[in-house]
């Protein structure tokens, strides 16, 4: 990791005497190395670069937990998006999940039972940058997970 950071940003990350570093390439790819990343500095970077996360949770609906979190993995395959969302807390979480873009035919896949159900309770919301998110209501039991599967609208 140290070698990669040194190659990409020209710094030695084991040293304390550097500031945040930013880089870009000919294909308009951008890199950021934040010396002391916090939720606030990441949110500021996303705002400055006009980035939106693939997925966001309504933080106000997630009970504070001493251990555990809501986590996710997002993969795309054959034109469909697969989100595996896990609740590692000791409480059932009822939350709104925002997926970047407009989705058709959303389904909930329960990996514990094999049950697949259509998600009918969703809505589109326009964002300040003109893009959209699809908001869905989810209840995820304690220490479990669910797949949300869908295809983005054209």
Q: What name fits each language-model region?
A:
Residues 1-154:
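Carbohydrate-binding surfaces of carbohydrate-active enzymes
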């Amino acid at each position: 990791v140290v070698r990669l950071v040194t190659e990409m940003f020209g710094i030695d990350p084991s040293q304390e005497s550097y500031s945040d570093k930013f880089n870009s390439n000919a294909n308009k790819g951008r890199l950021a190395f934040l010396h002391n990343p916090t939720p606030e500095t990441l949110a500021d970077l996303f705002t400055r670069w006009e980035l939106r996360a693939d997925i966001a949770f309504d933080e106000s609906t997630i009970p504070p937990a001493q251990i555990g979190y809501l986590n996710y993995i997002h993969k795309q395959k054959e034109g469909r998006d697969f989100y595996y969302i896990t609740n590692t807390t000791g409480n059932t979480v009822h939350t709104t999940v925002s997926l970047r873009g407009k989705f058709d035919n959303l389904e909930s896949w329960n990996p514990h039972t094999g049950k697949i159900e259509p998600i009918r309770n969703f809505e589109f919301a326009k964002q300040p940058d003109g893009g959209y998110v699809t908001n869905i209501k989810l209840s995820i039991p304690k220490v479990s997970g669910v797949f949300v599967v869908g295809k983005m609208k054209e």
